[in-house]
UniProtKB/Swiss-Prot annotation:
Bias (Acidic residues) ranges: 294-306
Chain intervals with Low complexity compositional bias: 278-293
Alphabetical list of Pfam families matching this protein: Ribosomal_60s, Ribosomal_L10, RL10P_insert
Similarity comment: Belongs to the universal ribosomal protein uL10 family.
Superkingdom of this protein's organism: Eukaryota
UniProt name for this protein: Large ribosomal subunit protein uL10
GO molecular function, one term: large ribosomal subunit rRNA binding
Keyword Disulfide bond listed: no
Localization, UniProt: Cytoplasm
Chain intervals for the UniProt region annotation (Disordered): 278-312
Record carries keyword Ubl conjugation: yes
Length: 312
């Protein structure tokens, strides 16, 4: 009895030490994870993060005991359920998450297991004898006999994502040596500096954030302009639009000031500027003409040279 109490006290002390030392942690699911996989994950995280497992009742009791000093960790309590553990770190969260979820192993289908994604049987020659054709037909898998063996003629989805694998489907997948499941640690929730959020947040890239920000600014500016309510994103557009209106009123009222004299001159004397444009174009073409003539002469000389060889 004394040994159990000592172990609990030791666990509580270690959990508190990690909660105070590390600013971030992952709540990880460890269903169907082998001890070898856990060993590999610990090995890859060594020096960057620490893994701590424990019974949920003991973890909840420990956290509740720390709440007077560490109130932010109350947010973790709803996620301490099922087969879970903790990974503590001060390293970049995305990097640690990638290490956590990367160690996965393939596993055969079991009747009653829930498919995490669609399970397909691909078109392939199975190498099986024709006597097992009825087994495929019962599951709606199209087959033909090719060179004395059963061949699946097209891809077939045998289990939809989220559905349970039936006994027949499990038998078929195992018969074909298809291991549709992968088992490994999963990230249930992330805690970082007092905030708790799902791991999908870590998948958002900087480019996506910038894109969403630019889109939001554009939307705010459009709405602000439409309702005539000034906001920081719309002020620049408002000033430009108002200045255009000011120019239009000034020109219509023949009220000229130095900053618009050039614009007024272009409006009142368009032919002057229209004549200047062809002149500039002809000048450019005139400069190009001698260059083209020189190039043509060089080509002629080159062609003439080609008529003579060393032995003529």
């Amino acid at each position: 009895m004394g040994g159990i109490r000592e172990k609990k006290a030791e666990y509580f002390a270690k959990l508190r030490e990690y909660l105070e030392e590390y600013k971030s942690l992952f709540v990880v699911g460890v269903d169907n994870v082998s001890s070898q996989q856990m060993h590999e994950v610990r090995k890859e995280l060594r020096g960057r993060a620490v893994v701590l497992m424990g019974k949920n009742t003991m973890v909840r009791r420990a956290i509740r005991g720390f709440l007077s000093d560490l109130p932010d960790f109350e947010k973790l309590l709803p996620f301490v359920k099922g087969n879970v553990g903790f990974v503590f770190t001060n390293e970049p969260l995305t990097e640690i998450k990638n290490v956590i979820v990367s160690n996965r192993v393939a596993a055969p289908a079991r009747a009653g297991a829930v498919a995490p994604e669609d399970i397909w049987v691909r078109a392939v020659n199975t190498g099986m004898e024709p006597g097992k054709t009825s087994f495929f037909q019962a599951l709606g898998v199209p087959t033909k006999i090719a060179r004395g063996t059963i061949e699946i003629v097209s891809d077939v989805k045998v289990v939809d994502a989220g559905n349970k694998v039936g006994q027949s489907e499990a038998s078929l997948l195992n018969l074909l040596n298809i291991s549709p499941f992968t088992f490994g640690l999963t990230v249930v929730q992330v805690y970082d500096n007092g905030q708790v959020f799902p791991s999908s947040i870590l998948d958002i890239t900087d480019e996506e954030l910038v894109s969403h920000f630019v889109s939001a600014v554009s939307t705010i500016a459009s709405i602000s302009l439409a309702i005539g309510y000034p906001t920081l994103p719309s002020v620049g557009h408002t000033l430009i639009n108002n200045y255009k209106d000011l120019l239009a009123v000034a020109i219509a009222a023949s009220y000229h000031y130095p900053e618009i004299e050039d614009l007024v001159d272009r409006i009142e004397n368009p032919e002057k500027y229209a004549a200047a444009a062809p002149a500039a174009t002809s000048a450019a073409s005139g400069d190009a003409a001698p260059a083209e003539e020189a190039a043509a002469e060089e080509e002629e000389e080159s062609d003439d040279d080609m008529g003579f060889g060393l032995f003529d």
